[in-house]
Amino acid sequence: MKYAVIGDPVSHSLSPVMHQVNFKSLNMEDTYEALHIPTQDFHDIRHIIEDNHINGFNVTIPHKERIIPYLDEINDQAKAVGAVNTVKIINNKWIGYNTDGIGYVMGLKQVYPDLENAYVLILGAGGASKGIANELSKIVQPKLTIANRTMSRFETWDMDINAISLEQSEQYLDEFDIIINTTSAGLNNNDDIVISLDNLSSSTLVSDIIYIPYKTKFLKEAEFKGNTVYNGLDMFINQGAESFKIWTGKQPNILEMKYAVLNKLKGV
């Protein structure tokens, strides 16, 4: 079987490294590659996938919403989020899934076991935020708080949440047990920081879904203040592991997948 990740750009993706190591550790002859599909060519996606003999694929930026009209079916999680990151192909039928939210929450449970009673603030209101919020809402009892720069973004949300501005979130930081940044601030070593952490409580877990760099400026600042921090590496590994399960019905070797990505990040 042949799998791929599609995006624009996509050459930076660590998904091929992660999945190839997993296939090898399980003695599978399947392959996984990065397939660059420019936005202007996306209308031909069905033919491109068929011509490359792809049996299933992951979808990354900027195609997670764009793929939806080309699918034959979409599962409830992806429908709720309005974005797809995994496509399974059965007898030429394309089925869309979203494993980002569950991937993040699986990892978060390991570092914050009392998730059920946590007061959670999510920064950003894009697809990643919605996926994580949708999954957290199944576990967390207190109402989730989502902060975004523009309030109009919440018009597409169909969830029972507290919607506030980023400025408001800075005032109430000390009320939260977990703060999760889902914005692109800090990506690729830029020095942007989404909010001021001046009012941060020392007991708050501070998280960022970015894993390149391993610690964003946001996490470094929180760590400097003495807080526990948690990046997006587990989310990346777990969403890939969930995709593998969807495609093959088999259990992935998550430890090998994580080592492969860590070694690549370290330049080993």
From Swiss-Prot:
Catalytic center residues: K64
Membrane-traversing stretches: none
Protein keywords: Amino-acid biosynthesis, Aromatic amino acid biosynthesis, NADP, Oxidoreductase
Pathway membership: Metabolic intermediate biosynthesis; chorismate biosynthesis; chorismate from D-erythrose 4-phosphate and phosphoenolpyruvate: step 4/7
Binding site for NADP(+): D76, G124, A125, G126, G127, A128, N148, R149, T150, M151, S152, R153, I209, G232
Subunit structure: Homodimer.
Protein name per its UniProtKB record: Shikimate dehydrogenase (NADP(+))
